[in-house]
A protein has these predicted regions:
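C-terminal motif of bacterial Sec signal peptides marking the signal peptidase cleavage site
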Residues: 17-19
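Positively charged n-region of N-terminal signal peptides that target proteins for export
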Residues: 1-5
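Sec-dependent N-terminal signal peptides
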Residues: 6-15
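A sequence/structural signal for flexible, mid-protein segments enriched
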Residues: 21-301
Length: 301
């Protein structure tokens, strides 16, 4: 009798295991393809950079399980930017060397002006029309000085697990008369510094002036150490004065991406790309404008 009970138990366990190994195929529909816009129109306080060159990148969204190695750039689009105060139109032409990159050398952006991006493109298998508008207010304040603070992990100021390096600091006067929003980008050897620890996120810092006063002595550009290979390397800090709407879009995007624990945001962040063909299928990304100042230095010994 005891032997029968054991056999019965084995049969039950075997049946249970077989049931757990059953594979169920579920077909999931891919979401509709959307346009992704990256770029904008910028005025430079450094006259050497104020050449009239502007660029817009267009690509399409890809399926969740799609290959990251595939080319999702959108080619053959019609891209125009309208200066709203004058009605002047600037046509962007696609780069001969990079698919999906649209450029012009004729748009000298102006302060206190707004600009509207106008795009007609094949997205998926449908011709769609898009618009997006942003503005440039006043000029970004010049950065007076760039400095470096040597740091290590034991100091507790950095968060990217690099043993040693430098924190970048700048000084500039922040006007109190206006409510301003800033985006800082740091370049090492003319390439945007990236945090390889979290999968290649660009090191971009956002600031708003409610946390700053006039005649700011110093601002820590980011809490990440710059991974240095040798002294004398050129470092450039770019500060963009952006609109309030751009600031909160980027802030939400970065915050969601960080909370998700991956490169994908925890929730979809809606930008300013309006789909005139199908308003429910709005574009991803953001068309933003602003004034930029920059400063360059070299890595100290």
């Amino acid at each position: 009798m005891k032997a029968l009970k054991i056999i019965g138990a084995l049969l039950i366990v075997t049946c249970f295991n077989l049931a757990c190994e059953k594979v169920i195929d579920i077909e999931l529909e891919d979401s509709k393809t959307r346009i992704v816009v990256e770029g904008g129109v910028f005025q430079y306080t450094n006259t050497l950079l104020n050449t009239g060159y502007q660029a817009i990148n267009l690509r399409s969204s890809h399926p969740y399980f799609g290959s990251l190695d595939s080319d999702y750039s959108i080619s053959g689009a019609e891209v125009t930017v309208r200066e709203n105060q004058t009605g002047d139109l600037y046509v962007f032409t696609e780069s001969e060397t990079q698919s999906g990159l649209y450029e012009t050398n004729d748009l000298l952006a102006k302060l206190n002006h707004s600009y509207t991006l106008i795009v007609t493109a094949m997205v998926g298998d449908e011709l769609q029309h898009f618009e997006a508008t942003d503005s440039i207010s006043h000029a970004a304040p010049p950065m007076d000085e760039i400095g470096f603070h040597k740091d290590s992990m034991k100091d507790g100021l950095n968060s990217n697990n690099i043993d040693h390096g430098y924190l970048t600091l700048i000084s500039f006067s922040e006007p109190q008369a206006t409510k301003d929003y800033y985006k800082f980008t740091t370049y090492l050897n003319d390439s945007i510094i990236r945090n390889d620890i979290d999968g290649g996120t660009q090191w971009i810092l956002l600031k708003r002036d409610e946390h700053l006063d006039a005649d700011v002595d110093s601002v820590i550009i980011n809490d990440y150490l710059i991974p240095l290979e040798e002294a004398g390397q050129p470092i450039r800090v770019e500060m963009t004065l952006i609109s309030k709407e751009t600031y909160f879009y980027l802030f939400t995007l970065f915050e969601n991406s960080a909370n998700a624990g991956s490169d994908f945001p925890a929730a979809e962040v809606k930008g300013n790309i309006i789909n005139l063909t199908d308003p429910n299928l709005y574009g991803l990304g953001y068309f933003h404008c602003g004034s930029r100042s920059d400063i360059t230095s070299t890595v100290p010994e």
